[in-house]
């Protein structure tokens, strides 16, 4: 930097150092300025001033070229220089400020500071300022009006600095000072440039807006576009001609239709127009469409919109991720199914031969007061108007699942379940338990949306097991079902599905279930009914390895989860000690697969890790991506795992004791059912918890007073159903969880009751039950701790909701009863909860996607159809799927030929 620049900075832009300003006395400032700015042709007065200046230090002398002024400054008039010299004599001594003079406000009061002697002057060159002593300057900045000499010096400095004021890096138009306004600050101009550059980048990244096909060509891109005018010119005057006005009006019309899809492409606008409704991180400025009005079922359209969306998403997902045939080696063999005699089957049958008394009240229908008592493995006919079905399993229900059926098959629906043999039996979880049990398969017939089921629910066959209690059971999601009439060479049987059982002895059993028609055709005509079989499983899954196998180390197996996407080769299980274990079912590794002498397989896990400090109560696989898994344990934690990095969970949440999870297909989170023992007051119930990717807070789906034992979600409907200890089964339609649920209004409109079970006392004579307490809805039964005491003095009252329509839902009696129970219900926990609901499952099949099965402590299983959520869109999908299924699967010949391939007749080339 030359001395000219240093002299100008010292005078015009003195920088603050500490609390003082670094300037010399006015006379010294003028001398330094003149020393730097004078030319080679000086007057005598200027020469005398030059001689009074101190000698510069070595190395800082000015060369003649540096001391020469620019040509435009050499034309300075002599008159100004003489006036400058005359004024120098007047300001050679500092002028003291007047004591009563005010400067912008009140005068400061206090002791005066002693004046320090002026230090010897030194040339203002870089590096000579005393940085260690910032208070070494002798004189503060002079107050008061500036003298004529100072004004002349300021004018001279501005003229000298004008050629260097413009920076080549900034456009000249950015720093123009508007007339009558203050100059724009540097920060504001930089921010404006940044916004303009950001608008240009967004405009290039966004697709071009769709223009009107019949409109003229867009104007030249060199002309800046006008985004939107506040008002048209009065009288419609034309300024730039008709063609330009025509382009302008077409542009405004397109923007009105598309709601400002992106920012303006022009960078010459002072402020880029960005819509305020555009969310952060989104690439489109389109607003969320508003669904106003009411749907035909009586619910608002904004509540039904996620349901219609889930239908499309689930249909597309199953077409891409499901298969028609998997595990071809596990075909049922007739010789492995041994039919038990009545004496042999007796230890495996439930002890209760008759159900407790129960009555059903249906909303909108007259009460008949009929009490029902049905036999074991029997059912009652479906109601002709409400289509609900009930049957008795013989014991408390602890495990339940639907058999998956391909879309469009139109076949009968089946459910597999396990009931405890004894109504009063308890199962300790801390130790392994084995004993007789019965796995039941029930046929429900063809469940449709157009008509009432014509057939009763019937017991198909049972499988006798010696592995104790079955805590969980899961069917293979797809690829395990084939047509009932599939011709098989004996002893092969057409397969209904692959079923995995989580047993209390620590083992996981895998069964290949045949179609009932083919299996029952193998038994003799005088066979005992019901049919109970002793079956050899196709595979036994154990923890450990071939060298070290100790099932007691992990404890009981409490939960199962089958990989939801094809080829469904992985099966996960949760154990009592907090371990999560994974098996590769089609593995050929000799370290993981052993063939036993009876022909069955024994499989060992390929991966396991400690997920929780206590028992793993439930597992849920992410349907959209099989790399992710959610688990909930007795340590009150919910964890999300990436199976590629199982050493640490993605997210861990400790809130309450969770009983079951439901992970719906379209959403990035799980719906959680909880035990009320650790729940805060008013927060017990059902919550939706985000996995952590979107960062949403927990959404309170529905409040519950008692423990929610079971939870199930329907991917087709975007709806969850929950059954609790108080005997109430409710359903809740989830909002679109891809958006933040914090803005969801009136969640009470999204949930509705399906039925409510109450334990009602009655008189000694069954013909005269006390219906007064049932009608009041406030039962007050005596405390009975055993099943026998309870059924001798009570009966169950099921109060069903009309699910065909939801018109005026908030004012209907079942809805008011549900809301009253959410706030003022009283639980009696020191008696047998005979009305409690233990398991709830939505049908995963498209042909029966609106049907729901539930059961609990009483052993009664009930089936309901949520007819109000069925839509014409779902019916159209069913018809399309049936046509597609019939085109893919040709009807097979009834005759069996030797050597016929078991699978070649089933699959056709994919179109």
Swiss-Prot record:
The gene is GTF3C2. Gene3D superfamilies: YVTN repeat-like/Quinoprotein amine dehydrogenase. PANTHER family: GENERAL TRANSCRIPTION FACTOR 3C POLYPEPTIDE 2 (PTHR15052:SF2), RNA POLYMERASE III TRANSCRIPTION INITIATION FACTOR COMPLEX SUBUNIT (PTHR15052). The modification Phosphoserine is found at residues 63, 132, 165, 167, 220, 260, 597, 871, 892-893, 901. Residues 253-262 have a biased composition (Acidic residues). Coiled coil: none annotated. This is General transcription factor 3C polypeptide 2. Residues 35-46 have a biased composition (Polar residues). Pfam families: WD40. The modification Phosphothreonine is found at residue 895. Residues 263-275 have a biased composition (Low complexity). Residues 34-187, 205-297, 765-785, 889-911 are annotated as: Disordered. It comes from Pongo abelii (Sumatran orangutan). Part of the TFIIIC subcomplex TFIIIC2, consisting of six subunits, GTF3C1, GTF3C2, GTF3C3, GTF3C4, GTF3C5 and GTF3C6. The lineage of its organism: Eukaryota, Metazoa, Chordata, Craniata, Vertebrata. GO terms for cellular component: nucleus; transcription factor TFIIIC complex.
